[in-house]
């Protein structure tokens, strides 16, 4: 099975280490353009753009990067309860047209009650999912060209319609991740691709089976994806040393404060991430080559695959054997790590690579000329 590999745009910040300004770098448009262009050239299928008050706006970032990329797709957030589903449908169609069919959408219900209250959304966990189901039903039908009347508990529209359709027909694909029963019910009814964070394979297999069964009960099939960090090096020893180095500036107080902040979330997925490490740094390898160190201070995706190219590829294939065809990777810092993943991991996987753009120059990778005259010796990529 060919795998669809995405990268990640760190609009919330980037650097060499977690939890410190040491080695940090400014994440401006120039830097984001570098990462997007690298992902575009290296063969990543798309980039996930995060959402929330700690991030730059994902829609504006995506729109700004359309002109500087050629094939890269942009996975941006839909926020039920924060924006009207009909307005979101118009925005989605416009982004799809402006990008010539390179827009993808990620339904994000939110998991931080404090942040949601600041955005004017005062619904509990169950109510948010009720509203998200209503939002998605309207959004999908409007994008597909229907004139929609809808009278729900949380949302009501009359005569909602779209005059300018998207490029992708009947509409751009919808992605979504969530671990609660309500989230799985939503995925089974509404989305094309269900995402999970990087839990151990047995836990992921259980979630996939549950969503697959619920989707089948509605006569639907759902694809599956996973969100993971990657620390890949030429040797396993180098990779584990890089993992240790990434959290080398973290102290116990920083970890404790981060975990206390994340504990207020009512997201089941976030609770499952936190349970993998328990806020302790002594047992971070929670499954073979699956390292939970990132989650000590980072919300959301908190695990990384660690190892050399063949080792990480073997772990990726374990997830693929469960039915996952889409992998959304990231690594710190994101520019350099995009190259490492492409150079050290891609050769060991069957990756769906977008067609390379035509160029007037010699773009085959061959290194630097020897003595200004001799082509370097070729090395097999297998």
UniProtKB/Swiss-Prot annotation:
Family: Belongs to the SsuD family.
Catalytic activity: an alkanesulfonate + FMNH2 + O2 = an aldehyde + FMN + sulfite + H2O + 2 H(+)
Oxidoreductase found in the keyword field: yes
Cystines in this chain: none
SUPFAM superfamilies with a match to the protein in the record: Bacterial luciferase-like
InterPro entries from the UniProt entry: Alkanesulphonate_mOase_FMN-dep, Luciferase-like_dom, Luciferase-like_sf, SsuD_RutA_monooxygenase
Molecular function GO labels: alkanesulfonate monooxygenase activity
Keyword Metal-binding included in the entry's annotation: no
EC number(s) reported in the record: 1.14.14.5
GO biological process: alkanesulfonate catabolic process
EC main group: oxidoreductase
Native organism: Pseudomonas entomophila (strain L48)
Superkingdom assignment: Bacteria
Protein name as annotated: Alkanesulfonate monooxygenase
């Amino acid at each position: 099975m060919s795998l669809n590999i995405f990268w990640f745009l760190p609009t919330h910040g980037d650097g060499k280490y977690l939890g410190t300004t040491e080695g940090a770098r400014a994440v401006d448009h120039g830097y984001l353009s570098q990462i997007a262009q690298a992902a575009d050239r290296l063969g990543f299928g798309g980039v996930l753009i995060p959402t929330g008050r700690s991030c730059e706006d994902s829609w504006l970032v995506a729109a700004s990067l359309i002109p500087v990329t050629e094939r890269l797709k942009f996975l941006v957030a839909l926020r039920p309860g924060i924006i009207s589903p009909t307005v979101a449908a118009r925005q989605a169609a416009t982004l799809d047209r402006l990008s010539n069919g390179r827009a993808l959408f990620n339904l994000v219900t939110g998991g931080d009650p404090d942040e949601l209250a600041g955005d004017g959304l005062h619904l509990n966990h169950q109510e948010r999912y009720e509203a998200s189901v209503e939002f998605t039903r309207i959004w999908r039908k409007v994008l597909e060209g229907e004139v929609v009347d809808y009278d729900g508990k949380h949302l009501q529209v009359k005569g909602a319609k779209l005059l300018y359709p998207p490029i992708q027909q009947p509409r751009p694909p919808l992605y979504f991740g969530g671990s609660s029963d309500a989230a799985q019910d939503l995925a089974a009814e509404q989305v094309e691709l269900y995402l999970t964070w990087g839990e151990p394979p047995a836990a992921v297999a259980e979630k996939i089976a549950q969503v697959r069964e619920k989707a089948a009960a509605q006569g639907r099939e759902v694809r599956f994806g996973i969100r993971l960090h990657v620390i890949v090096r030429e040797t396993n020893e180098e990779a584990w040393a890089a993992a240790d180095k990434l959290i080398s500036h973290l102290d116990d107080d920083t970890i404790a404060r981060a975990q206390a902040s994340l504990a207020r979330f009512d997201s089941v997925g976030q609770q499952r991430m936190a349970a993998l490490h328990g806020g302790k740094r002594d047992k971070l390898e929670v499954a073979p080559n699956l390292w939970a160190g990132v989650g000590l201070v980072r919300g959301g995706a908190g695990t990384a695959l660690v190892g050399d190219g063949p080792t990480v590829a073997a772990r990726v294939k374990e997830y693929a054997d469960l039915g996952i065809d889409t992998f959304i990777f990231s690594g710190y810092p994101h520019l350099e790590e995009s190259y490492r993943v492409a150079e050290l991991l891609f050769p060991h996987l069957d990756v769906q690579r977008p067609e390379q753009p035509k160029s007037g120059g010699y773009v085959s990778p061959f290194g630097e000329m020897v003595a200004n005259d001799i082509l370097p010796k070729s090395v097999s990529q297998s």
